């Protein structure tokens, strides 16, 4: 079952910890997901595409922030976590990115301002037991201003906002400067009362930030494609017959949603072939060529990442995708 339905149908009580601490659960946000006007489910090709675009070099995604906006004041996004992790591992400098082996699907519920430039994002995930879980961390973003605060571990566990910096990876660091993270108030109260020592605080903060911090670049890349002409392919899922059968059997109806694909890269490569490789001159050693973004006014040119140096990988017709915003 999709994560959006697991959250919408969630009725489990919030997790209760020793000493009576009641913490937010997925069921607290069931109504918000059910009433969300825009629910998007990302196809595998789009998950791969947005991750590649997010970490492209050149002017980088951060040079296109003025073109990005959240398309609705309330948005639900959902993706298959295994596909996202596979896409990150395929990017050489992201191979060591923290990944969760527990999550099956990951989703975010975004509340944005009318312009779609600032907002807050809450993360959810499902495990293989078909249970929905709510993250302890909230993500605030502002695409017009740098909002990254200094790192203060003790203050962060008390509910203050915290930033994530990656100076060794400029493409990601620029995006993260527009993002800050903070614990849900109930979780902050719980951790503050736990009286953790410095090493425990550091370990905990790494755990809660480890996977969530790397969602935002992919999401921003998605919204860039969303704003571009013909950047995405939308398919409204028709659940009328299925839901009729579910109601007749006493089950909850599934939520309408839109499946989103990325057709923009399909025409840029020929199928892989080993034909005529003997006639080709010997090329350089096989190596990875990183994606590259160049912007010319309202047009963005994205040079796709690719492998170079081995003809057996196929004949490439073009590796440049043009995104137009007018």
In which residue ranges do the predicted regions lie?
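Intrinsically disordered, low-complexity regulatory segments
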Residues: 1-271
């Amino acid at each position: 079952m999709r994560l959006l339905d697991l959250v919408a149908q969630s009725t489990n009580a919030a997790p209760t910890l020793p000493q009576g601490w009641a913490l937010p659960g997925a069921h607290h946000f069931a109504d918000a997901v059910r009433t969300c006007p825009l629910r998007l489910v990302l196809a595998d090709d789009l998950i791969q595409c947005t991750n590649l675009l997010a970490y492209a070099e050149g002017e980088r995604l951060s040079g296109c922030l003025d073109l990005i906006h959240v398309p609705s004041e309330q948005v639900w996004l959902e993706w298959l976590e295994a596909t996202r992790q596979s896409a990150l591992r395929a990017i050489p400098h992201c191979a060591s990115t923290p990944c969760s082996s527990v999550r099956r699907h990951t989703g975010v519920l975004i509340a944005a301002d009318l312009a779609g430039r600032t907002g807050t994002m809450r993360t959810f995930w499902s495990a293989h037991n078909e249970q929905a879980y709510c993250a302890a961390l909230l993500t605030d973003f502002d695409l017009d201003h740098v909002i990254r605060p200094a790192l203060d571990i003790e203050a962060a566990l008390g509910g203050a906002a915290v930033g994530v910096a990656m100076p060794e990876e400029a493409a990601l660091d620029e995006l993260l400067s527009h993002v800050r993270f903070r614990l849900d108030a109930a979780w902050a109260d719980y951790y503050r009362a736990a009286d953790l020592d410095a090493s425990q605080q550091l370990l905990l903060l790494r755990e809660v930030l480890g996977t969530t911090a790397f969602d935002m670049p992919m999401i921003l890349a998605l919204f860039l494609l969303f704003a571009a002409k013909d950047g995405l392919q939308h398919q409204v899922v028709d659940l009328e017959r299925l839901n009729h059968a579910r109601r007749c059997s006493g089950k909850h109806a599934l939520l309408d949603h839109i499946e989103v694909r990325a057709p923009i890269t399909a025409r840029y490569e020929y199928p892989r072939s080993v034909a005529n490789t003997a006639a080709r001159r010997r090329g350089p050693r096989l190596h990875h060529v990183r994606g590259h973004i160049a912007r010319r006014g309202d047009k963005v040119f994205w040079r796709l990442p690719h492998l170079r140096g081995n003809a057996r990988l196929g004949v490439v017709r073009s590796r440049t995708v043009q995104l137009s915003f007018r």
